[in-house]
Amino acid sequence: MRNKIIAALALAVIAGCGPDDGAADFGKGEAAYAARDLQTAVQCFKAAAAKNPTNFTARVKLALANVDLGEIDAAREAVESAIAVDPASAEARLLEGNIAYLAKDYALAKAAFADVSSARQLPRELRSKAMVSQAVLELTATMVERARVSLWRAVRLDRRNAAAWYHLGYLSRDTFRFEDAALEQFQMASRLMTDPVRMKTVMQDIIPTIRESLRAKAAGKPGAAGRDPGAAAKLVSEGEGLAKKDPKKSAAKFAEAYAKDPLSYAAAWGFAKSRSGSAKSDREIARVLTAFQDAVDQRPNSQLTYRTAARFALERRRPIRAEKFLSQALAHDPEDKTTLALYVQTLRRLGKTAEARLFEAYLKEL
């Protein structure tokens, strides 16, 4: 197909353009496309492309309009003709990949996304877009961890890529169930979006729903209804004062504070830290792990809290629990090298060698 397009273009160039170079048709196509009159836009862009064999932009716009109409075969033909005009265009190559994805030609899509995302000479913004497309392709193949890393790479390339934050939000909310991270990611996406319809959905539906879910989760914790923050703060202060002089009494103060207010970070953290050394039975270990989880729920951006919790879980032979703590930590800060290194170690301990290699490769990029 592509060879035929190149041959046709060559003949057209030899013949030369007539007095009508398609500029008027292109202008009408632009106006129709802006008004979402897609059928008219297609006809106008098609006419512009036919009249000017070197009009690259008309061919790209024709491909986009056909995509919007769901005419994928026509879109593929249009983008191939655009690439024939400008074989070096990374934008056209990325569009070719996105159209191939819609046509379920995943091999071509994968190759196109890799070509663009790995080309260091290209603008970072374009490479970031290719990374997001690659992540979507990986999600289609249920390669969740690979998609996650691709989205992290997309953000590193362009922190203003709304689509990357948007897809990270969905991953955090729907796959990993990390609503606190999802809230941050959707908020970031909403600040960067230019599509008013999608922005409205995120700001008026998605974000309020997550906030309400987090509020209900906190309110549903045992003891939350009758919490006494003032008494808990006083007991935490007393516990901290006794930490070196009388560790046993200090631990008792933290336990009392935690009972008074399960939503206090200081109380949950103090309880978990003071009991982690002596927790041996399954019941004691579970209690400490719950306290660590309560602590990170209150300070979801504290990498130290996650790592301390994960190390305790590893010491008590709970690597799956450690993996979850660290995965949640990375949802908030995927560029923390210490957390990433511990995550790789934990994955290897779980026998997840392929995943460990994936995250280790990402760590080396930082």
Task: Place the predicted regions along the sequence by residue.
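TPR-adjacent "capping" and linker segments in tetratricopeptide-repeat scaffold/adaptor proteins
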Residues: 17-24, 120-128, 217-234, 296
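Helix-start (N-cap) detector for alpha-helical repeat units in TPR-like alpha-solenoids
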Residues: 21-25, 56-57, 90-91, 123-128, ...
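Alpha-helical segment of the N-proximal tetratricopeptide repeat
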Residues: 23-54, 64, 68, 230-252, ...
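Canonical tetratricopeptide repeat
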Residues: 27, 61, 95, 126-133, ...
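Structural signature of tandem alpha-helical TPR/SEL1-like repeats
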Residues: 34-44, 69-81, 103-115, 141-150, ...
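Structural marker of alpha-solenoid helical repeat scaffolds
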Residues: 51, 85, 119-123, 157, ...
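Terminal, low-structured helical/coil segments at or just beyond the last alpha-helical repeat
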Residues: 191-248, 341-366
